[in-house]
């Protein structure tokens, strides 16, 4: 085994192909108030941010009163859970990768800008929850990605140094957080890049 002792996974776009779900759910909530995010802006400006931060950004560029943000956020979470119930399914290559890495002795964690309830629901439906040693959500930190706090806090909870951790990330905010944390980075383009072979190859290169 390499000197890596833990593998830290982002969730959306890494373990779960959920970017479109968040886009659909947020716009469903926003449309009730005459607002909408384009698909381009969601990918290039809002990708990887917590809903609270997305709404704060929207408030600066459009007429979206601050007093509506919490209500819209709650609506968005409700719509997201409805979509998860319909669409979130296990992906064999992820089950195989995490189960094998777990057997090999690696600590496994999910570090996501999503809410804890959403993470647990997705991980249960993807049949990955049993392999995780730790779940970190946006509710566990003061500053979400691109701030590295979530990764630094995870490393401390696992009692590990940054150089002992491999982080899998897919978007600019997550990648910035991973790099700033000092951990090793495996950049992911799609959820299908997350497989045992790719992770093992990266581990052997460290």
Regions found by a protein language model. Give the residues of each.
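Hydrophobic beta-strand core positions in alpha/beta domains
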Residues: 109-110, 187
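Conserved phosphate-coupling serine/threonine residues in phosphotransfer and NTP-handling enzymes
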Residues: 14, 112-114
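Asp-based, Mg2+/Mn2+-dependent phosphohydrolase catalytic module
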Residues: 1-7, 95, 99-102, 115-206
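Residue-level marker of alpha-helix boundaries and capping positions
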Residues: 17, 88, 110, 164-166
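Short, conserved structural micro-motifs that define repeat-unit consensus positions
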Residues: 102-108
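A broad detector of the eukaryotic-type serine/threonine protein kinase catalytic domain
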Residues: 59-60, 81, 85, 106, ...
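Short phosphate-binding/catalytic loops that engage adenosine nucleotides
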Residues: 35, 106, 183
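N-terminal helical cap/lid subdomain that shapes the substrate entry/recognition surface
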Residues: 2-95, 99-100
């Amino acid at each position: 085994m390499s000197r890596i002792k833990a593998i830290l996974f982002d969730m959306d776009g890494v373990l779960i192909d959920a970017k479109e779900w968040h886009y659909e759910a947020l716009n469903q909530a926003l449309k009730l108030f005459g607002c909408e995010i384009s698909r381009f802006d969601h990918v290039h400006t809002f990708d990887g941010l917590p809903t609270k931060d997305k709404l704060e950004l929207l408030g600066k560029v459009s007429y979206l009163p601050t007093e509506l943000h919490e209500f819209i956020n709650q609506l968005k979470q409700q719509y997201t859970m409805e979509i998860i119930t319909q669409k979130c399914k296990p992906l064999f290559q992820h089950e195989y990768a995490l189960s094998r890495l777990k057997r090999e002795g690696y600590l496994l964690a999910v570090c996501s800008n999503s809410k804890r309830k959403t993470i647990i629901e997705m991980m249960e439906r993807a049949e990955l929850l049993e392999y995780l040693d730790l779940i970190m959500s946006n509710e566990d930190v003061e500053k979400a990605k691109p701030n590295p706090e979530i990764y630094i806090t995870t490393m401390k909870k696992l009692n590990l140094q940054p150089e002992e951790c491999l982080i899998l990330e897919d978007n600019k905010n997550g990648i910035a957080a991973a790099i700033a944390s000092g951990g090793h980075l495996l950049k992911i383009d799609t959820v299908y890049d997350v497989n045992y072979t790719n992770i093992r190859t990266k581990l052997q290169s460290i």
